[in-house]
Amino acid sequence: MNLLNLFTYVIPIAICIILPIFIIVTHFQIKSLNKAVTSFNKGDRSNALEILSKLVKSPIKNVKANAYITRERIYFYSRDFELSLRDLLQAIKLRPKTINDVYSFALSYHILGEPERALKYFLRAVELQPNVGISYENLAWFYYLTGKYDKAIENFEKAISMGSTNSVYRSLGITYAKIGDYKKSEEYLKKALDAEPEKPSTHIYFSYLKRKTNDIKLAKEYALKAIELNKNNFDGYKNLAEVNLAEDDYDGFYKNLEIFLEKINFVTNGEDFNDEVYDKVKDNEKFKELIAKTKVIKFKDLGIEIDDKKILNGKFLV
């Protein structure tokens, strides 16, 4: 067979055979990715991980990378932070780094008690996408989590000026509630709820607001709705426990607090019991025993090393 025949007949025929197979395989593997996410959202973590353990072996590089990043999110929300970070590192070896990777590292560092490292990533995201609202929204969320509410509001408002809406409304709602501006808090949370009525976090924030304004009945309704919308969201149980405590339902408080502590396995940065509602039980032996049993995890406890400079530098797909 001469070279002309190779290019004229053989290669086009091979492409016609291989390309449809590639498209079909990719299609079914993407469906499997979606199935894994659905399984996790329904509470079937083991089935989701079983599906993804097969997809990370895919011969198709893009599918493999997406499987790692999907599994990374599941590990993250399941609080297996070491496995989450390992999968994130695998994903960025297989495809160009993205802005979402920056946020994943940033949030992991914050949760694991490395705020200085987290801030570097959030600021890098602003450098990479200075004209995109999500960059400022995520930076604002960092400031919120570290209690710098004025800076949080400043950056949330910047995000709104760039077109961000629903999630920023939700974030501004809880931020204003934290500083005691309940009127503005309600204004923003109503906007968030109108736009996305099925978001559990909006119901949690509304529950917090109503508890702070002594509308305990409505606070409980929002708390129960948040759990109904997502039983995996451990924050919902902590919030409901706080509502129980506000209404002097100590059995309900301990029941939901124990569910929360069981789901989180350990306490990370930002998960505290400093709300004034805990004054009711801070000297209670049962409460002290529960908190004493709770483990705290930091980044240094993980058996993993990450070269921040290498990750933050270089090209990004933005």
UniProtKB/Swiss-Prot annotation:
The keyword Transport does not apply. It comes from the Bacteria. Keywords: Plasmid, Repeat, Repressor, TPR repeat, Transcription, Transcription regulation. Disulfide bonds: none annotated. TPR repeats lie at residues 65-98, 99-132, 133-166, 167-199. Transcriptional repressor of the sol locus (adhE/aad, ctfA, ctfB and adc) genes for butanol and acetone formation. This is Sol locus transcriptional repressor. The lineage of its organism: Bacteria, Bacillati, Bacillota, Clostridia, Eubacteriales.
